[in-house]
Amino acid sequence: MILPNAKAIIGFGFAVPKGLYKAMENGNQFYTYTTLGVKYIDEEMAEIFLLKMGGMIEDEGYDACLQKAIPNLKIKGDKTTNPEVVDTYELIHAEAVEEGKPVPDVIIDFGKAAFSCGLGEWGLNGKIINKEYGPFMRYCFIITDMPLETDNELKDAVCDKCGECIKACPGNAIDKNGLDSWQCSVYYKGAHKSNPFITDEFLKDNPERDAILNGEKRFDCESAREIYKELSFLPNTQWGYSPCLCGRRCDIACFKHLKGEM
């Protein structure tokens, strides 16, 4: 356990402005979503918020173990990736300090935490879906020994497996079983024909060019990392976030379905 004497986990959600998604949907602006909708919320707003909230809890004599997104690390045994960053690192060399204890670095499952807090649940598209904001949210948490009156876990499913996200993905990275994160990472970074920054020079000597652009090529860990070298349409941000060039179409389709717009 991260905090052995913990009594509660407190969840916080930050809404990403819908206008950032609309700008991508219209094909007018992509970089602002990556900077303001992902990086600044997770790396600055959430951090400051957690430190302030944690300070308030500890001023009352309790412990506050702050939990923010750790975008580029994967616990030992987790072979997935995070499409939002340049690459991820699995903690393959980590070992528990003694038998029966978890292998560090312990990273909480945000989807399970959000579910426990009544905030949302994992959807088919690999994002946490909230009843009000859909996937247009970022999250952070505090584990504490403060005795609190807690909310109930979610009782009703938020994701109804409608499949709109499956149809929307330009890289065919989602199916009825969920998200293929390595496939997603390639097309999130722009290897699809609807990427407005692609030129005729892109992969011009690659015999699989058409299959890649049409989302027909399947990528795994090795092949995805190999093609990353070609996906430099916009600069990566500070903290290593990759520009979102798929327009988060899966999220937009999910939100529209949730609101009865499709």
Please report, for each region that a protein language model flagged, where it lies by residue.
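Non-catalytic, usually N-terminal nucleic-acid engagement modules in DNA/RNA processing proteins
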Residues: 1-51
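Catalytic cores of enzyme domains
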Residues: 35, 39-262
